[in-house]
């Protein structure tokens, strides 16, 4: 099937703890962005429990999206889904929903790379055209820029993602994930009241960073009665954010690009935004941060990236729509950028 004059794409996101459905047009209008989050009673994400949540939430989230967009399923001309990377059980649940919709409606299916989608929704919503991108979330920490048909990775974490580092520390500190207030936001609020910078490991190796030692050191200090939690949260943030800002600045200097884009769940952090804004200004570049509603995992970013891919000749036959748990950013062709 060839693209219609106005492609209407429904996107399904299910890589981790969020099940999201977005609806986007080929003109770049986001008509709906609905989601439901799995919140574990304790600890981090349990993949099979999260997948069960997604399966149970799918019908409701789909209905909310159709209602918000004021369209019915037969109006949709394309189905996109997050094909990877992510947690296997969660990815498979979303892929099953997407395959069922595409088959029932007899319309094309497009598998989307989750990391590419975070970049593309950031570009759409901020107007950035050719940025150095810092993508930071619970599962990814990547500095990238476009070159020769693909997004090229300039630097990344050697161990754990920035969002995971912050979340694990927050749980160890006794903070709770509540609906509407994720752990990272709770930690950010405490950090805003911190005044004392406590020395912690700072590990940058070339263009890559390591966060596990920082987390271990900060967690061990939770038992110290003479160190306030606010100061510890502040110090953890300052060290971690300085690391990713340093490697982002190096990529900016190397590429000589004139835009910086911050995207992913951690992009909501105002302190990180401020640090990146400083280095962008020093290099005569414009800083852009993805809007809050599109920072965390969402279906709209999958829908929009699906539109971009489909209108440039990309489709995914159902027999080849298997999920890709470790689908790296630089392995994805990006034909919509010339």
Where do the protein language model's features map onto the residues?
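N-terminal beta-alpha supersecondary unit
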Residues: 4-77, 81-85, 114
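A short helix-loop
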Residues: 2-7, 14-15, 22, 31-32, ...
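Short Gly/Thr/Asp-enriched flexible loops that form oxyanion-binding sites at enzyme active sites
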Residues: 81-105, 270-279
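Conserved phosphate-binding/catalytic loops in two-lobed NTP-binding clefts
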Residues: 111-112, 277-301
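Conserved phosphate-binding catalytic cores of ATP/NTP-utilizing and phosphoryl-transfer enzymes
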Residues: 1-6, 107, 111-132, 305
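A contiguous, well-structured pocket-lining segment that forms one wall/lid of small-molecule binding clefts
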Residues: 72, 185-260, 269-283, 310-313, ...
